[in-house]
């Protein structure tokens, strides 16, 4: 027999004996009576509340009408020459309050405002002789008049003490004491009356307390009525709404339910016992058995339930549960793998790595070494963008495979335990645990990790221009928790990048100080205190003879209040990497243009000024527009200015519209640090520049390798392209003479002059002229060099 048939035959006699329908009928009847009685009570209270409100409204209106129609105010405005009119007005206002006061405890206030809504006089029926108009009421009157623009208005609000009040104002003409025909602040005044709604407030609080629900005040009636909701119109367009808390009526209904349940509980108990006795054997026991098996599955005490072969609902239910748990187990294993592992590389993800690492660190032993390695694939974004995401993904998979295989090899050869993970993008982490006897295990592991990239082995990793930088942190010296170890390993990794990439760096306190200083520099740059802490220095450069001053190179100096002196070698790369150098470039250009007139006044001739441009700004036409505006503002001729760009970025000048725009506007362009990059002869010929500046290290290298004669053909090539040549870093007479013999056009270096502030240039010029007194008179001039001068 089917289970549903068997249950029907077993429970039908019990249902007939219970006769539960009678209890439902009784409950419904009592519920309706309770709701009707409660509704009547609430309606009576809300109407009583409205009655108090209307009484107060009548009181306020009577005060306002009495004042408007009485001679009190008329005498005040008509007897302007009476010196006692103000005292009489105040006395009359207080007398009016006492005459019309219906209740000594009820606070009533009378005020007169001028046309500018400023308080003239105030009186109230309190015992405080220094009472003043409540500022919240004053603000409300102004807001109410501004929003309604009515000549007369009565409305409800609360004062600063949180008391319910009813406020009425009437705008009257000072001459007619009636409603003005037009609004002129000089000819009108306001009569303001407000009364504290004590009875209204007491009743409202009692209703709210009894019903555990606030009374809402609104300017529109409720759109529909639900439950015991009550509403009453206090005045035209102003309603009070009460929606009692359902739990109050529900509590009373629950009380009725409990009484009914108690009365029918005894009779139902016998019925339940009979049902349980019958159902236990035929229904409950099989279900309990199934439930126990399901619980064991949930507690991982068994993999699945036993399938029942009975031909009934419980048998089919057990079969379906069996199939469902089989599918759930399979899905759980797949989901667990996705949640704990990176879907692309199949390595652990960041979350799983931290969970496993925390567990491992909590169980570490003194006989073990533990390292955390942070690995970043250098240039991966470039490869991913240039060759496509498919190539990028394959590189990540290849690197992950290499990491996984290396971990297995070390487990076999060095008895290590490792956890490898892909943290994000091109960043990986490895936690390596080795026995105490292997002190250099992390170093060997890192070297083998880099081997396919460094040695260009026959591996997918060697087919593309990517490298890897590795930072290593040691437990517990560099951190006792995985978060700290990862952070410090990341810091070491960035040090490896800064040292040239494709290498390994260990975390240390000194390294942390370097990183901390870099962060401090970045934070200080973001504050933008350029005018307070930045200043310009000017280093002169001369013709090849060293007799004629040609111009000055603008150099940026930073004296930070917090960091002390910060060299350009420190803060310029940080500014470029963080995108802040655009602001610094603009500050330098603006400051140099501002000071150029002073500079020329000092040297008494038009002078050339060279300004370095950040490589990060070379693709911005907006900078050219800024330069043009600054030049117009400070009266700077483009012919006075040279902009210097580094050789490494000048090689791609065709892609930098800024250079072509500056050249079009008439500014000079110079390739700075020539010799530090890899410029071909073709590129040198094609450069849209007028000057070449040889790098100091390039010149030092030629001297150190005894290849000084290499400089002559380079200078001749530049001259053949109508380019001037500047040599920087001249620090000795020998170096000066070498370059002068090869007809280098301009010289710059400590041999001729140090970087100076604007105020130091004039004394320096005077000292330089004094030293050069052995030359012919007036040799010190400011013209372009002739070729004969260098011979």
Swiss-Prot record:
Residues 281-333 form the HAMP domain. The chain crosses the membrane at residues 260-280. GO terms for cellular component: plasma membrane. GO terms for biological process: signal transduction. Residues 24-259 are periplasmic. Residues 281-791 are cytoplasmic. InterPro entries: Biofilm_reg_signaling (IPR052155), EAL_dom (IPR001633), EAL_sf (IPR035919), GGDEF_dom (IPR000160), HAMP_dom (IPR003660), Nucleotide_cyclase (IPR029787), Rev_trsase/Diguanyl_cyclase (IPR043128). It is found in: Cell inner membrane. Gene3D superfamilies: 3.30.70.270, 6.10.340.10, EAL domain (3.20.20.450). Residues 1-23 form the signal peptide. Keywords: Cell inner membrane, Cell membrane, Membrane, Signal, Transmembrane, Transmembrane helix. Pfam families: EAL (PF00563), GGDEF (PF00990). The keyword Transmembrane applies. Residues 368-509 form the GGDEF domain. NCBIfam families: GGDEF. Plays an essential role in the maintenance and the formation of the three-dimensional structure of the biofilms at the later stages of their development. Absence of mbaA promotes the accumulation of larger amount of biomass on the surfaces at later stage of development, results in the overproduction of an extracellular polymeric substance that accumulates in the matrix of biofilms. This yields biofilms lacking the typical structure consisting of pillars of cells separated by fluid filled channels. This is Biofilm architecture maintenance protein MbaA. The gene is mbaA.
